[in-house]
Amino acid sequence: MSNEAKVEMVPMLQDMRTYITNHYWSEILCEVEEQLPGFKAQMPSCTQGTRLFLHHEESKIVKADFWRRSRTKMSADLYVRLKIGASKNGELPRYFVENMYLSTDFVLDGTIQWLPESTVLLDECPEREDWTKLSKYLVPIFSYDDMELQVQNMLKTYLGETAVTAYQPRAAWKLTKAMELQISSAPLFKNRRTEAILFFQEGIARAERQVGDETVMEEMVIPAKTILLNSNAKSFQRADGDGREIFHECIHYEWHTMFFTLQALHSADLRLLEYGEADRASRPAAKDVRWVERQASYGSTAAALPRPVLMPMVHQYWAEVVNQSINPGDKIAHVIYQIAQEKQVSKGLIRTRLIWLGSPAAKGAFNYVNGRYIANFAFDRESVSSGDTFVISRTQFLDLYEQKEDFRELIDKKLYVYADGHVCLNT
C-alpha cells in the first residue's frame, strides 16, 4: 500500500473581480474619466482649471462587492484606487491618488455584458440594505430562512399567489412552463445517479442506446433552456414523484444562471468544472460549489411543499394526537401519514421538510431500514445534532464493526447490540 498522501482536488473557478479586471477595467476607467470633473471640489486645489485623466496601469480595484438585481443582472460596487493626472496648458501632469467608489452593472445570461451607462463614480459606499449579496463567484448568499422566502417569491412570481397558499399538483412542471423551459428525457450513459441536467445553451448529452444485446453511447444535441431528465435514475421511475429533480434545475436557472455563465458552462453540470490541487486560495471555490448544490437541493424540497402550505396541515393533524399517550415518533408519523394521504406526496418529502423546518422529532418517524419501515421512536433532542441520526442499516453496522476498533470492542463486550435499525444499550 502506498504511503503517499492523497492530493486534494478542488474546482478552479473564475471570480468576477478578476474577470472585470481582465476584460472591462480599461473601458470602465474611460467612463470614470468623464465623471472626474464633477469631483474637483473634493480634490487637491491644484486640479482647478486643469484637465483630469486617469493613469490606467496604476489604477486598480481594491475591493469588490456584488449584488443580485435579478436572475441575470448584478451590480458591482468597487472600492478603487485611482491614480489621477491633472494637466494645464501643455505642462507636465501632476499625479495624485484618490480612493473612491464606483458602481456598475452587468448582465450574465450565457454571455457577459457590461452596461456602461450604469457606471457611477461615488465618494462613499452605496447603501444596499435590502439587496441580496453575491459571492465573488456570483453565488447568492442566502441563509436557510432566506431560501424559504426566495422559493416562495419565485413561485409567486411565476405561478401566482395560490402557489404558496394551496398545494399545487405537478407544480414543478407548471413552473418549468412558466419559466419558458422545456423538459426532455433520455437514459444517460452509464449514469444512474444524475437525476436531471439543465442546459442553459444548446449542448451535448451522452446517452445510451441498445444495439442488439450491447449498450452503446451516442451523443444527443440538447436545445437551449431544456431540463433533461435521466430515465436511468430512480427518481424517473417513482410513481409518487414530486418533481424535486425538476425544481432542482429550476432553482439553478433562477439563482445560479450568473454563476454558471461566469464559469463558461453551458449546462448546470458541476462535473464539467476544471479541478486542480487544493491550496488556501482555492478553498472558497470549493465552498461555493457545495453551496450551489446545497441551495438547489434545499430550494427544490421547499418548492415541492412550501412552508405556508405545509404548516397548517401539520397543526391540524398534530392536534389529533397531541394528548394521546404515544411516543413523539408515533405522533409525528401520524402527521406525516395523514398529509401524505391527503396530498398524495411521499412520506419522505414531508419528513424532510419537518426536520428542516425545526422539528427534529421527525427523525424518529418512517425510517426505512433493511428493506422495511422500522418502529417509530422518540429520543432526547439534546442527544443528537442536526446532521446525526440514531438509525443505521445492517450493512453500515457491519462496516463500522470491521473498520473501527473501539466500536468493535464495545460490541464484543456485549455492551451494545444491533436491533431494528439501532445500536442499543444491552440491558
PLM regions with names:
Residues 1-427:
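Active-site hotspot residues in diverse enzymes, especially metal/ion-binding acidic/histidine motifs
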